[in-house]
A protein has these predicted regions:
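Short, acidic/polar
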Residues: 5-22, 43-46, 70-75
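Active-site groove signature of glycoside hydrolases
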Residues: 19-40
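Active-site mouth loops of central-metabolism enzymes
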Residues: 1-12, 33-39
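Core alpha-helical elements of the protein kinase catalytic domain
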Residues: 16, 25-28, 49, 58
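Beta/alpha (TIM)-barrel catalytic core signal, keyed to glycine-rich beta->alpha loops juxtaposed to Asp/Glu
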Residues: 35-170
Length: 170
């Protein structure tokens, strides 16, 4: 909470604080969650690489980075001889997929990176709980978030998923 941005000082301080809170010696997978326009990417890449070199982190991951910035991170890591990310975490699901499949998936395949999506169930919408465009009317903590997907196109996807499930006795 006290750490903002991805400067070298912030990255190391946040990792050390996480290790202390966890009571652990090493973090298995450490994410850069958002690109930081105020810090040169080379500084961020070097900082994450140093965490791996120093044994505080086993692997690096990036989340919410554009394909161009992921490619730039990889190039910088190779140039510096530091650890490359092994995971990309995009917002990806059946409702939000075209830009990911067009650009990020080919990059991940080419560079042998894993994809670990967030909002895989479209904030709960793809569970099938919401069957109309008034999803926000549900009195649940997640209903408002799921409501953005409760469109005619979204409901068509739910209907298709239900038909597939029914065909398989699910």
């Amino acid at each position: 909470p006290d750490f903002r941005g991805l400067s070298a000082t912030t990255v190391r301080g946040a990792a050390e604080a996480s290790l202390q809170r966890l009571g652990a010696d090493t973090i298995d997978l450490y994410y850069a969650h958002f690109d930081d326009a105020d810090t040169p990417l080379e500084e961020t890449v070097q900082a994450f690489g140093a965490l791996v070199t120093d044994g505080l982190v086993r692997h690096v991951a990036v989340s919410n980075y554009t394909p161009a910035r992921v490619a730039e991170w990889l190039r910088i890591a190779d140039d510096l001889g530091v650890a490359r990310p092994v995971v990309i975490q995009p917002h990806y699901n059946l409702m939000h997929r075209s830009e990911i499949e067009a650009d990020l998936v080919p990059l991940a395949e080419r560079e042998n990176l894993s994809l670990v999506p967030y909002f895989a169930l479209a904030k709960g919408f793809l569970t099938g709980k919401y069957r109309s465009t008034d999803a926000a009317a549900h009195d649940t903590p997640r209903a408002a978030a799921a409501a953005e997907y409760a469109t005619d196109a979204g409901l068509a996807i739910i209907d298709t998923l239900a038909r597939i499930g029914d065909a398989h006795g699910a």
